[in-house]
Amino acid sequence: MTLDHLKLFRDVVLARNMTRGAEISGVSQSAASQQLQEAERLLGVDLLDRRTRPFELTEAGRLYYEFCRDVLRRKEEFDRQLDRLKGRVQGTVRVAAIYSVGISDMARLELEVGARMPEAQLLVEYLRPEKVYDAVVTDQADLGLVSYPESNREITVIPWREDKMMVVAAPSHPLAAKKKLAPSDLAQRDFVSFDDDLRVGREVKRYLREAGIQVNAVMHFDNTQTLKEAVILGAGISIMPVRVLRNDIEQGRLVAIPIKGCALVRPLGIIHRRRKTFNLATQVFLELLRQEAAAELPAAGQLVAR
């Protein structure tokens, strides 16, 4: 059996689905089934209990899964140590990120990676939050960038940064001329919100409820890009993370106004599989992320464009 066979079994187990595991490993579903049947024939035991949906691991299957995982981790560690001996930063950094992490920030990081690690490759895929977690758990991504990160038995969290949230409005909106808003200024205003299935949407709704403010919810979206465009076009105001709107604010397309006494922030974190061994390129990229988070941002007042 080859490393590819071990990886296939690990991927199938993590995905809890034969078709999905085969897709992650880059083989067809029929080829994956044949490889697993061949492994069972060589080992002389059943690895999967196929009578249940989703399938369950047999006792032998659990032992084999631990073996596959340990061998693949040792291979990752070997590659990392070999890179160190060569004194070269090589390899691929696979990142899964939510759409609103800040594409301009990621573009700057990609340029920095190219300058510092010309022999390394950075691959970034933008996904919905639950898909980012799935990509990390199934080892399609080395790192995930998410808001309101949560750890579990498979995933650990590295705190990254906190994005200040403010009211955003089109420059022509009546509130745009104010330097600071009282919570009551938002009452009965047309409001464009994030979907409730997004944590950021629920947190904004909680803030408004606790402040005793009723807004006129006119639209809701599942991504920052569409939401900000609705605000720019005058559909209403919103409360959004300001960092990802810097270009629009600097270009005069949006105005950001702080709310008195509002400490609402959107925490962002870096997630990865527990006991994950990173290649040298990924370690350098992690350090770049930390440096990027530590970079000083303009003060709130400087972000308000009129």
Predicted feature residues:
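Flexible hinge/capping segments at coil-to-helix
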Residues: 152-165, 169-191
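A late-sequence structural motif
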Residues: 105, 255-298
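A short LG(V/I)-centered, amphipathic sequence patch enriched
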Residues: 40-59
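Alpha-helical linker/hinge and terminal dimerization helices associated
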Residues: 42-43, 64-86
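Central regulatory/effector-binding core of bacterial HTH transcription factors
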Residues: 86-153, 220, 303-304
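Secondary-structure junction motif
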Residues: 190-211, 278-282, 286-287, 292-304
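Hydrophobic hinge/microswitch elements
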Residues: 128-133, 137-141, 146-147, 199-257
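Short helix-boundary/capping micro-motifs
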Residues: 11-28
